[in-house]
Protein backbone atom coordinates (compact mmCIF):
# COMPACT_ATOMS: atom_id res chain seq x y z
CA UNK A 1 0.00 0.00 0.00
CA UNK A 2 1.44 3.36 -0.97
CA UNK A 3 2.15 5.74 1.85
CA UNK A 4 0.07 8.88 1.75
CA UNK A 5 0.04 12.00 3.87
CA UNK A 6 -2.43 14.82 4.30
CA UNK A 7 -1.40 18.33 3.20
CA UNK A 8 -0.85 20.70 6.12
CA UNK A 9 -0.32 24.39 6.78
CA UNK A 10 1.46 25.99 9.72
CA UNK A 11 0.06 29.08 11.40
CA UNK A 12 2.48 30.00 14.14
CA UNK A 13 3.20 26.94 16.28
CA UNK A 14 -0.02 25.19 15.19
CA UNK A 15 -0.16 22.76 12.25
CA UNK A 16 -3.50 22.41 10.48
CA UNK A 17 -4.42 19.32 8.48
CA UNK A 18 -6.04 20.76 5.35
CA UNK A 19 -7.67 17.51 4.27
CA UNK A 20 -9.18 16.99 7.70
CA UNK A 21 -10.46 20.57 7.84
CA UNK A 22 -11.98 20.31 4.36
CA UNK A 23 -13.63 16.96 5.05
CA UNK A 24 -15.03 18.18 8.37
CA UNK A 25 -16.59 21.20 6.66
CA UNK A 26 -17.90 18.92 3.92
CA UNK A 27 -19.48 16.69 6.57
CA UNK A 28 -21.25 19.71 8.06
CA UNK A 29 -22.52 20.85 4.65
CA UNK A 30 -23.66 17.37 3.63
CA UNK A 31 -25.46 16.82 6.94
CA UNK A 32 -27.18 20.21 6.74
CA UNK A 33 -27.97 19.71 3.06
CA UNK A 34 -29.58 16.32 3.61
CA UNK A 35 -31.77 17.62 6.43
CA UNK A 36 -32.71 20.75 4.48
CA UNK A 37 -33.52 18.74 1.34
CA UNK A 38 -35.66 16.24 3.24
CA UNK A 39 -37.47 18.80 5.41
CA UNK A 40 -38.26 21.58 2.93
CA UNK A 41 -41.89 21.85 1.85
CA UNK A 42 -43.09 19.48 4.57
CA UNK A 43 -46.75 18.51 4.25
CA UNK A 44 -49.39 16.71 6.30
CA UNK A 45 -49.15 13.85 3.81
CA UNK A 46 -45.39 13.25 3.97
CA UNK A 47 -43.25 12.46 0.95
CA UNK A 48 -40.79 9.57 0.96
CA UNK A 49 -37.86 11.82 1.88
CA UNK A 50 -39.89 13.38 4.69
CA UNK A 51 -40.82 9.91 5.91
CA UNK A 52 -37.16 8.88 5.89
CA UNK A 53 -36.14 11.94 7.90
CA UNK A 54 -38.92 11.43 10.44
CA UNK A 55 -38.04 7.74 10.73
CA UNK A 56 -34.40 8.57 11.55
CA UNK A 57 -35.50 11.21 14.07
CA UNK A 58 -37.92 8.81 15.78
CA UNK A 59 -35.27 6.08 15.73
CA UNK A 60 -32.77 8.31 17.56
CA UNK A 61 -35.38 9.40 20.09
CA UNK A 62 -36.44 5.82 20.79
CA UNK A 63 -32.97 4.52 21.63
CA UNK A 64 -31.84 7.57 23.65
CA UNK A 65 -34.88 8.68 25.67
CA UNK A 66 -34.41 5.89 28.22
CA UNK A 67 -30.97 7.29 29.03
CA UNK A 68 -31.75 11.00 28.98
CA UNK A 69 -35.23 10.74 30.51
CA UNK A 70 -38.51 11.61 28.83
CA UNK A 71 -38.83 14.87 30.79
CA UNK A 72 -35.52 16.10 29.33
CA UNK A 73 -35.85 14.53 25.89
CA UNK A 74 -37.47 17.57 24.29
CA UNK A 75 -34.43 19.64 25.29
CA UNK A 76 -31.84 17.31 23.78
CA UNK A 77 -33.65 15.52 20.95
CA UNK A 78 -32.30 17.79 18.19
CA UNK A 79 -28.78 17.62 19.63
CA UNK A 80 -28.78 13.81 19.63
CA UNK A 81 -30.42 13.66 16.19
CA UNK A 82 -27.81 16.04 14.74
CA UNK A 83 -25.02 14.12 16.47
CA UNK A 84 -26.17 10.81 14.99
CA UNK A 85 -26.45 12.23 11.46
CA UNK A 86 -23.10 14.03 11.66
CA UNK A 87 -21.22 10.95 12.85
CA UNK A 88 -22.95 8.71 10.29
CA UNK A 89 -22.02 11.06 7.43
CA UNK A 90 -18.46 11.54 8.73
CA UNK A 91 -17.96 7.78 9.03
CA UNK A 92 -19.11 7.08 5.48
CA UNK A 93 -17.48 9.92 3.53
CA UNK A 94 -14.15 8.14 3.21
CA UNK A 95 -15.82 5.14 1.59
CA UNK A 96 -17.19 7.19 -1.29
CA UNK A 97 -13.89 7.86 -3.08
CA UNK A 98 -10.11 7.82 -2.88
CA UNK A 99 -8.44 11.02 -4.07
CA UNK A 100 -4.65 11.17 -3.98
CA UNK A 101 -2.16 13.38 -5.83
CA UNK A 102 0.81 11.99 -7.75
CA UNK A 103 3.18 13.14 -5.00
CA UNK A 104 1.31 11.17 -2.33
CA UNK A 105 -0.99 13.77 -0.77
CA UNK A 106 -4.32 12.34 0.39
CA UNK A 107 -7.25 14.65 -0.37
CA UNK A 108 -10.21 12.53 0.71
CA UNK A 109 -10.85 10.69 3.97
CA UNK A 110 -13.42 10.20 6.69
CA UNK A 111 -12.85 12.77 9.47
CA UNK A 112 -13.46 10.02 12.02
CA UNK A 113 -10.57 7.96 10.57
CA UNK A 114 -8.27 10.55 12.18
CA UNK A 115 -7.44 10.01 15.86
CA UNK A 116 -6.91 13.73 16.54
CA UNK A 117 -10.39 14.51 15.21
CA UNK A 118 -11.97 11.73 17.28
CA UNK A 119 -10.21 12.86 20.46
CA UNK A 120 -11.21 16.48 19.89
CA UNK A 121 -14.79 15.63 18.97
CA UNK A 122 -15.18 13.27 21.94
CA UNK A 123 -13.72 15.92 24.24
CA UNK A 124 -16.24 18.45 22.93
CA UNK A 125 -19.14 16.04 23.56
CA UNK A 126 -17.80 15.19 27.03
CA UNK A 127 -17.46 18.87 27.98
CA UNK A 128 -21.02 19.47 26.75
CA UNK A 129 -22.30 16.70 29.04
CA UNK A 130 -20.46 18.18 32.03
CA UNK A 131 -21.69 21.71 31.32
CA UNK A 132 -25.28 20.48 31.07
CA UNK A 133 -24.83 18.52 34.30
CA UNK A 134 -23.74 21.67 36.13
CA UNK A 135 -26.55 23.68 34.54
CA UNK A 136 -29.24 21.16 35.53
CA UNK A 137 -28.00 20.16 38.99
CA UNK A 138 -25.97 23.13 40.09
CA UNK A 139 -22.31 22.91 41.02
CA UNK A 140 -23.07 21.31 44.39
CA UNK A 141 -25.23 18.55 42.98
CA UNK A 142 -22.77 17.99 40.15
CA UNK A 143 -19.77 17.56 42.47
CA UNK A 144 -21.78 15.31 44.78
CA UNK A 145 -21.79 12.69 42.04
CA UNK A 146 -17.99 12.44 42.27
CA UNK A 147 -17.71 12.11 46.06
CA UNK A 148 -20.68 9.87 46.86
CA UNK A 149 -19.59 7.49 48.27
CA UNK A 150 -16.26 9.05 49.22
CA UNK A 151 -14.25 5.87 48.79
CA UNK A 152 -15.25 5.75 45.12
CA UNK A 153 -14.07 9.29 44.31
CA UNK A 154 -10.84 8.19 42.54
CA UNK A 155 -12.75 5.63 40.48
CA UNK A 156 -15.45 8.18 39.61
CA UNK A 157 -12.80 10.60 38.35
CA UNK A 158 -11.01 7.84 36.43
CA UNK A 159 -14.32 6.85 34.85
CA UNK A 160 -14.62 10.28 33.23
CA UNK A 161 -11.32 9.73 31.41
CA UNK A 162 -12.20 6.19 30.35
CA UNK A 163 -15.58 7.36 29.05
CA UNK A 164 -13.90 10.03 26.95
CA UNK A 165 -11.24 7.62 25.67
CA UNK A 166 -13.77 4.90 24.81
CA UNK A 167 -15.81 7.33 22.70
CA UNK A 168 -12.78 8.32 20.65
CA UNK A 169 -10.90 5.03 20.34
CA UNK A 170 -13.91 2.88 19.48
CA UNK A 171 -14.95 4.97 16.50
CA UNK A 172 -11.35 5.59 15.37
CA UNK A 173 -10.42 1.92 15.37
CA UNK A 174 -13.42 0.83 13.33
CA UNK A 175 -13.41 3.61 10.73
CA UNK A 176 -9.64 3.72 10.26
CA UNK A 177 -9.44 -0.06 9.84
CA UNK A 178 -12.22 0.06 7.25
CA UNK A 179 -10.42 2.67 5.16
CA UNK A 180 -7.09 0.83 5.40
CA UNK A 181 -8.57 -2.42 4.13
CA UNK A 182 -10.44 -0.63 1.34
CA UNK A 183 -7.15 0.99 0.31
CA UNK A 184 -5.39 -2.37 0.32
CA UNK A 185 -8.05 -3.84 -1.96
CA UNK A 186 -7.65 -0.92 -4.39
CA UNK A 187 -3.87 -1.38 -4.37
CA UNK A 188 -4.33 -5.09 -5.03
CA UNK A 189 -6.55 -4.31 -8.01
CA UNK A 190 -3.75 -2.24 -9.57
CA UNK A 191 -1.11 -4.95 -9.21
CA UNK A 192 -2.27 -6.86 -12.28
CA UNK A 193 -5.25 -6.79 -14.63
CA UNK A 194 -6.35 -10.33 -13.76
CA UNK A 195 -6.74 -9.37 -10.08
CA UNK A 196 -9.10 -6.50 -10.89
CA UNK A 197 -12.42 -8.44 -11.07
CA UNK A 198 -11.73 -10.24 -7.79
CA UNK A 199 -10.56 -7.08 -6.02
CA UNK A 200 -13.52 -5.11 -7.41
CA UNK A 201 -16.05 -7.64 -6.09
CA UNK A 202 -14.31 -7.86 -2.72
CA UNK A 203 -14.16 -4.06 -2.48
CA UNK A 204 -17.89 -3.76 -3.22
CA UNK A 205 -18.69 -6.33 -0.54
CA UNK A 206 -16.35 -4.66 1.94
CA UNK A 207 -17.77 -1.20 1.18
CA UNK A 208 -21.29 -2.44 1.89
CA UNK A 209 -20.14 -4.01 5.14
CA UNK A 210 -18.22 -0.85 6.07
CA UNK A 211 -21.32 1.30 5.54
CA UNK A 212 -23.19 -0.99 7.91
CA UNK A 213 -20.38 -0.79 10.50
CA UNK A 214 -20.19 3.00 10.10
CA UNK A 215 -23.89 3.36 10.87
CA UNK A 216 -23.55 1.01 13.85
CA UNK A 217 -20.69 3.17 15.16
CA UNK A 218 -22.86 6.29 14.79
CA UNK A 219 -25.55 4.47 16.79
CA UNK A 220 -23.05 3.42 19.49
CA UNK A 221 -21.50 6.91 19.72
CA UNK A 222 -24.92 8.55 20.10
CA UNK A 223 -26.09 5.90 22.57
CA UNK A 224 -23.01 6.34 24.79
CA UNK A 225 -23.32 10.13 24.61
CA UNK A 226 -26.95 9.92 25.74
CA UNK A 227 -25.90 7.66 28.63
CA UNK A 228 -23.19 10.08 29.78
CA UNK A 229 -25.53 13.04 29.34
CA UNK A 230 -28.31 11.30 31.26
CA UNK A 231 -26.00 10.56 34.20
CA UNK A 232 -24.93 14.19 34.38
CA UNK A 233 -28.32 15.86 34.11
CA UNK A 234 -30.26 13.34 36.22
CA UNK A 235 -27.57 12.61 38.80
CA UNK A 236 -26.19 9.23 39.78
CA UNK A 237 -29.01 6.78 40.36
CA UNK A 238 -28.17 3.67 42.31
UniProtKB/Swiss-Prot annotation:
Q: What is its main location?
A: membrane
Tell me the GO BP annotations in alphabetical order.
proton motive force-driven plasma membrane ATP synthesis
Cellular component terms, GO, for this chain's entry? plasma membrane; proton-transporting ATP synthase complex
Enumerate the subcellular locations listed in this protein's record, separating them with semicolons.
Answer: Cell membrane
InterPro entries referenced in this protein's UniProt entry, alphabetically: ATP_syn_F0_a_bact/chloroplast (IPR045082), ATP_synth_F0_asu (IPR000568), F0_ATP_A_sf (IPR035908)
Superkingdom assignment: Bacteria
* UniProt-listed Pfam families: ATP-synt_A
Keywords recorded for this protein, A-Z: ATP synthesis, Cell membrane, CF(0), Hydrogen ion transport, Ion transport, Membrane, Transmembrane, Transmembrane helix, Transport
What residue intervals traverse the membrane?
A: 18-38, 77-97, 114-134, 167-187, 193-213
GO molecular-function term, one example from the UniProt record = proton-transporting ATP synthase activity, rotational mechanism
Its biological purpose: Key component of the proton channel; it plays a direct role in the translocation of protons across the membrane.
| NCBIfam families, alphabetized | ATP_synt_6_or_A, PRK05815.1-4
Q: Which family, according to the similarity comment?
A: Belongs to the ATPase A chain family.
Q: What is this protein called?
A: ATP synthase subunit a
Source species = Streptococcus sanguinis (strain SK36)
Amino acid sequence: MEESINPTINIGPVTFDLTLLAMTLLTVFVTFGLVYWASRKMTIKPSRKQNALEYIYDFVIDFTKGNVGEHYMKNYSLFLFSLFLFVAVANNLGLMAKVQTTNGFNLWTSPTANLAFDLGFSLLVTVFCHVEGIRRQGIKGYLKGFVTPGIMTPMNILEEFTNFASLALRIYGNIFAGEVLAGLLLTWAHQAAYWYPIAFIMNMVWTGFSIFISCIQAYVFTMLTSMYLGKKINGEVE
